[in-house]
Curated annotation (Swiss-Prot):
GO terms for cellular component: cytoplasm. It holds the Pfam family DUF896. It comes from Thermoanaerobacter pseudethanolicus (strain ATCC 33223 / 39E). Belongs to the UPF0291 family. It comes from the Bacteria. This is UPF0291 protein Teth39_0326. It is found in: Cytoplasm. Keywords: Cytoplasm. The lineage of its organism: Bacteria, Bacillati, Bacillota, Clostridia, Thermoanaerobacterales.
Amino acid sequence: MITREMIDRINFLYHKSQTEGLTEEEKEEQKRLRQEYVKEIKERVRRELESIKYANNSCEHCGHDHHHHHHHHRH
């Protein structure tokens, strides 16, 4: 779960690493936070893609059904 605090902490560690540098503990913490963050983002993307995939499938079935019901009248 990505929390506001987690984001703030990642930002804080990033800026500190750019300015004065991090201690070994902070480097470890930064690595853990980033892994957690990336894992969460990947999960979200996967869920998004799955819901989009299912939505598309049902739309296609819908579309195909409608085509069967249309009778083309030739003049």
